[in-house]
Amino acid sequence: VGVKSEAVTVVDGGGLKAFSVVVGSFGSKANALGLQQRLKNQGHAAQVAYNPSINFYRVIVSTFDNKAEAVSSRNSFRAQYPDAWLLLKK
């Protein structure tokens, strides 16, 4: 299972656990917040995190301490977000 490790800071959300499912990456904070709002409207506890080293905002749809749970969540979101991937918090 591919996991990318990044140092990110939560911009909008309750905080990240070890493994997070990323469904969108944007150079624009406004675009990231827009996707976050759409996900919230669908009932997800979506968050936005910022990676300053590459100047990108990550839209995170779910976050877990357990890798297996994160993989399962990512796989279920891939139907709607085929490029969903796992972020390991540095």
Task: Say what each PLM segment does.
Residues V1-F19, G27-K90:
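Extracytoplasmic
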